UniProtKB/Swiss-Prot annotation:
The gene is ARMC6. The modification Phosphoserine is found at S64. InterPro entries: ARM-like (IPR011989), ARM-type_fold (IPR016024), Armadillo (IPR000225). Methylated at His-263 by METTL9. ARM repeats lie at residues 220-264, 274-318, 319-369, 370-412. It comes from Homo sapiens (Human). Keywords: Methylation, Phosphoprotein, Repeat. It comes from the Eukaryota. GO terms for cellular component: cytosol. The keyword Lyase does not apply. GO terms for biological process: hematopoietic progenitor cell differentiation. This is Armadillo repeat-containing protein 6.
Length: 501
């Protein structure tokens, strides 16, 4: 772009010039959609550019100033067919048409506009950001209330539009919307499609939004989520969405609050809503569906937060299902092989979670879990995620359990862990978990130190220690317990300034 128009493209700070790297690191600058549109219009009117070229030039200029354009619709506004209005973006024109149809109570038109609204917002997150800025939520909320009179098709379209709009924008859901969402789920519990879309709204509203989580839990959403899995136990989309929403309820991901209620929510799911039983029973309907099994296992692992919950998984038959799933994956027994590696990772994560209970550790070993874990790591050696979770699960099984350590070593667990370290030298997670496993295997006796050292463990651990800062402490602990020389340094002696006499 020519210098004569450069000064017109100011994002606020650093007018007409490219920001330094220090400035870019300090703040990510943003502009309003109107500012971008004005720049595009200037290119068209003053520099005789075509719409596409005008947009491209505007993008290049703003990005050169360090402006974040991720929430900007990067197309030229269009003139309406009759030319009676100012140029506007398609999403805003559609929003205007939708508002008019809702105000006139024309359900068929409303449904058609909602469908088009969803399609546009799915294609570009900037569209839903702009729509939210221009009042999309109250318009969709009004359409939603219009649909509650008994139009199931319009109700589904309204929920779909709400789920798209709140994706990444959970602040949009207000108290009225929250109550209507719970009421809609309650009144339409028998309708799979409505339940699925409503739960998706719950998930989007709760992700990174602690207040929405707490308010929805108080409004009674948890029994609706577990009930959806029970009631629609063969409907893959409903089960998937419900599992995802349950997991989101156990997240602590909102940086705006000092602490969340993730632990309490997990307890409520298990104790008040029989969450573990619901999930374990649901697996029986999807034994040939790795994708849904991954969701169910991933949710189980989020709920195994207390000693008694870990034992409950075993008592409900969950352990035998987990070990069987792992064995089936290792033996290629599943008809659908797509997604098997993800399922293996989730099963391993769940075994790791329930192995926090010492009695469950022994139950896993008795059920043949160690052999299946070692086989999974060997078979999926190219996957750093599987290797990390395998080492972590074995690490938990060996913790405070010398007999389990012997079974792991004799079953090839140490060999597999060292192979994983060789295969993924740049993966800090693999290196860290492998070091912790080796440390636990030899912590209560030196019988396995020499065999493990003979496999080249010392060099691999030293390599992990030098390559990854996160491995420093666990690597030193592993080397120390293996009987290797480790230089232990005092990090602070208290001899600086006036701290020492």
């Amino acid at each position: 772009m020519s210098e004569r128009c450069c000064s017109r493209y100011s994002s606020g700070a650093s007018i007409g010039c490219t920001p330094t790297s220090t400035q870019a690191k300090m703040v990510s600058k943003r502009i309003a959609q109107e500012t971008f549109d004005a720049a595009v219009r200037e290119n068209i009117e003053e520099f005789a550019m075509g719409p596409e070229e005008a947009v491209k030039e505007a993008v290049e200029q703003f990005e050169s100033q360090g402006v974040d354009l991720s929430n900007i619709v990067k197309t030229a506004p269009k003139v309406s067919a009759d030319g009676s209005q100012e140029p506007t973006h398609d999403i805003l024109q559609m929003l205007s048409d939708l508002q008019e149809s809702v105000a006139s109570s024309r359900p068929q038109e409303v449904s058609a506009y909602l469908t088009r609204f969803c399609d546009q917002c799915k294609q570009d997150k900037a569209c839903r950001f702009l729509a939210a800025q221009k009042g999309a939520y109250p318009i969709i909320f009004t359409a939603w209330k219009l649909a509650t009179a008994g139009d199931q098709g319009l109700l589904l379209q309204s929920l779909n539009a709400l789920s798209v709009l709140t994706d990444g924008q959970p602040d949009l859901l207000d108290a009225q919307g929250l109550q209507l969402l719970v009421a809609t789920l309650t009144q339409n519990a028998d309708e799979a499609d409505l339940t699925c879309s409503g739960i998706r709204c719950v998930r989007h509203a709760c992700l990174k939004h602690e207040q929405n989580r707490q308010d929805l839990v108080k409004a009674g959403v948890l029994p609706l989520l577990t009930g959806a899995i029970t009631h629609h136990g063969h409907h893959t989309d409903v089960v998937r969405e419900a599992c995802w929403a349950l997991r989101v309820m156990t997240f602590d991901d909102d940086i705006r609050v000092p602490f969340g209620h993730a632990h309490n929510h997990a307890k409520m799911i298990v104790q008040e809503n029989k969450g573990l039983k619901v999930l374990i029973e649901a697996t029986k309907a999807f034994l040939d569906n790795p994708g849904i099994l991954s969701e169910l296992c991933g949710t189980l692992s989020r709920l195994a937060i207390r000693n008694e919950f870990c034992q409950e998984v075993v008592d409900l038959g969950g352990l035998s299902i987990l070990v069987s799933l792992l064995a089936d994956c290792n033996d290629h027994q599943m008809r659908d092989q797509s997604g098997v590696q993800e399922l293996v990772k989730q099963v391993l994560s769940t075994l790791r979670a329930i192995a926090g209970n010492d009695d469950v550790k022994d139950a896993i070993v008795r059920a043949g879990g160690t052999e299946s874990i070692v086989a999974a790591m060997t078979q999926h050696l190219t996957s750093p995620q599987v290797c990390e979770q395998s080492c972590a699960a074995l690490c938990f099984l060996a913790l405070r359990k010398p007999d389990n350590s012997r079974i792991i070593v004799e079953g090839g667990g140490a060999v597999a862990a060292l192979q994983a370290m060789k295969a993924h030298p740049q993966k800090a997670g693999v290196q860290k978990q492998a070091c912790m496993l080796i440390r636990n295997l030899v912590a209560h006796g030196q019988a396995f130190s020499k065999p493990i050292l003979d496999l080249g463990a010392e060099a691999l651990i030293m390599q992990a220690r030098s390559a990854h800062r996160d491995c420093e402490d666990v690597a030193k602990a592993a080397l120390r317990d293996l009987g290797c020389h480790v230089e232990l340094r005092e990090l602070w002696t208290g001899q600086r300034g006036n701290l020492a006499p």
